[in-house]
Amino acid sequence: MSRSLTSRQQHVFDFIVKTMNELGYPPTRAEIARALGFRSPNAAEEHLRALDRKGVIRMIPGTSRGIRLTGEEDAAATSTDGLPVVGEVAAGSPILAAAHIDRHCPLAPDYFTPRADYLLRVRGLSMKDAGILDGDLLAVHRTQQIRDGQIVVARLDDEVTVKRFKRQGHHVWLVAENADFAPIEVDLRHQDLEIEGLGVGVIRGGGGNGLH
């Protein structure tokens, strides 16, 4: 794709691609501002809007990580080695997400529907009745467009968990698929909840070097 980006816009774009490659999700405005030395997130917002107008990203309103790559850039952000395995996700009580790629699985994104963007390692048994077990790799499609009852990867207070999503008004319940675990109730007026993606498949026992 032909792009006429300014030097600063190119730096912002490169940081977005780097972050998505390393973490599996886009940066926030504050993270862009901090990394590139902007005085405030508003400066990052201006550059993001310029990139959106030039067609190299698409901004999704209503979420702090609402940045999507378009066309060739999206393909370039996907490793040719397969799907990246990103950190760990608590399937019990939430744990801090590991912000690094452990390895890659030799599996095409289009193996899953919708296509997977990365794999997250599951720890714990809170989702066992949905067939998601300790040590599995959960295939995740990056999106904030979800419906009640779907299994999501949610980030709550900088921690990540896999749960079934239910919402009523300002309240969200992150519901386990194990009677031993109580639902996590979130008041969106007072707590910061971000949906990192939708669970689209499971690789059983993904702790080894290959797929099982």
UniProtKB/Swiss-Prot annotation:
Protein role: Represses a number of genes involved in the response to DNA damage (SOS response), including recA and lexA. In the presence of single-stranded DNA, RecA interacts with LexA causing an autocatalytic cleavage which disrupts the DNA-binding part of LexA, leading to derepression of the SOS regulon and eventually DNA repair.
Quaternary structure (record): Homodimer.
Catalysis performed (reactions): Hydrolysis of Ala-|-Gly bond in repressor LexA
Full protein name: LexA repressor
Underlying gene: lexA
GO molecular function annotations of the record: DNA binding; serine-type endopeptidase activity
Pfam family, one: LexA_DNA_bind
Top-rank taxon: Bacteria
Active-site residues (renumbered): 126 (for autocatalytic cleavage activity), 163 (for autocatalytic cleavage activity)
EC category name: hydrolase
Annotated InterPro entries: LexA, LexA-like, LexA/Signal_pep-like_sf, LexA_DNA-bd_dom, LexA_repressor, Peptidase_S24_LexA, Peptidase_S24_S26A/B/C, WH-like_DNA-bd_sf
Lineage: Bacteria, Pseudomonadati, Pseudomonadota, Gammaproteobacteria, Oceanospirillales
Organism field: Chromohalobacter salexigens (strain ATCC BAA-138 / DSM 3043 / CIP 106854 / NCIMB 13768 / 1H11)
Alphabetical UniProt keywords: Autocatalytic cleavage, DNA damage, DNA repair, DNA replication, DNA-binding, Hydrolase, Repressor, SOS response, Transcription, Transcription regulation
Keyword field contains Ribonucleoprotein: no
DNA-binding residue intervals: 29-49
Similarity-based family: Belongs to the peptidase S24 family.
